[in-house]
Regions:
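Divalent metal-cofactor coordination and adjacent catalytic microenvironments
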Residues: 1-306
Length: 306
């Protein structure tokens, strides 16, 4: 007999770091710590690998602060399930675990877990808002006096078992290939959370620029046509994101805080210019942690923190 598996456990899987190594190195926030001595005696490659590991951990910490143990700010295609009652209009209003909701792909409902009826989701029967979506009946079940039913499920005040798939979060990916100046398209590692007409930022230091996805994009290809040719050339692995810059700023603060807390060779640059050893008791990391939490406060999602 097959077990009953919570689909959410296998769909919260798109975790891409929110900053790159170069973004940390070039940030004035990180200028207070010595990034060249994270691994005592290590070469440049070892130091870069150490920064990357700190970025992974800081990105996960930012997710935990905002969404609890399982969620991520990165755009993800999530399948969740729950029990819902129809409202007085006969509509099912669903508050998924995470927001912003970008699209709803599927919905099924039934009085028993094994007897759910799939509903074909479209803009005519599914109203998507930032933090909730409403599913009405199929168009064929509407009458002059309102909706009749969801397929085989008549409206009732009893809770119904629902399973739904939706996309939420902020597009966050990297360039899968280098892009030359004047290019009219970019190739990304993932197109999840990206839509035609959407503005994205290519975060590349002094060559950072914004692009807008052209209406000619087919919605699935990882090669994204853009409305205006690139101003700068960009190397592969550069971050491409719809995330607000405050999230990046917060993650860099968390990286700096981790370095100050380590006490394993990390150096803190004093205001007078003389480096001093950062011990495990270094209290200056608290200001970076506090600043990170302040920057992430707007992204707190209570529903996903049960």
């Amino acid at each position: 007999m097959s077990p009953s598996v919570n689909p959410a456990n296998i769909t919260y899987d798109n975790r891409v770091p929110y900053v790159t190594v170069n973004e940390v190195k070039n940030s004035p926030i990180a200028s207070s710590v010595d990034l060249s001595n994270l691994i005592p005696g290590g070469d440049a490659g070892a130091q870069t690998a150490a920064i990357q590991q700190l970025i992974y951990m800081a990105s996960a910490q930012a997710d935990n602060i905002c969404l609890g143990a399982t969620g991520t700010l990165c755009a993800t295609i999530n399948t969740e399930q729950g029990r819902y009652r129809a409202n007085r209009q006969g509509f099912i209003v669903v508050h998924p675990a995470y927001w912003p909701i970008l699209e709803v792909d599927s919905f099924a409902i039934g009085s028993l877990p094994g007897g759910q009826t799939p509903i074909t989701v479209s803009s005519s029967n599914c109203w998507v808002e930032s933090r909730q979506f409403t599913v009405t009946a199929n168009a064929s079940t509407l009458t002059t006096v309102g909706p009749l039913d969801f397929g085989s499920m008549g409206y009732t005040n009893q809770a119904q078992f629902c399973t739904y798939t939706y996309v939420n979060g902020f597009a966050n990916t990297t360039l899968a290939a280098s892009a030359s100046a004047s290019a009219t398209s970019i190739q990304v590692a993932s197109a999840t959370g990206i839509y035609a007409g959407q503005p994205l930022t290519i975060w590349d230091g002094s060559s950072t620029e914004s692009v807008m996805i052209a209406s000619s994009w087919n919605g699935t290809s990882t090669t994204l046509p853009i409305n205006t040719a690139l101003t700068y050339a960009h190397a592969s692995a550069v971050n491409v994101s719809a995330l607000p810059a405050t999230v990046k700023q917060a993650v860099i603060h968390l990286v700096v805080a981790a370095i100050k807390q380590r006490g394993e060779g990390g150096l803190v640059i004093a205001e007078v210019g003389a480096p001093t050893a950062a011990t495990s008791n270094d209290v200056t990391s608290s200001s970076d942690l506090a600043r990170a939490r302040d920057l992430l406060h707007a992204f707190l999602q209570v529903w996903g923190r049960t």
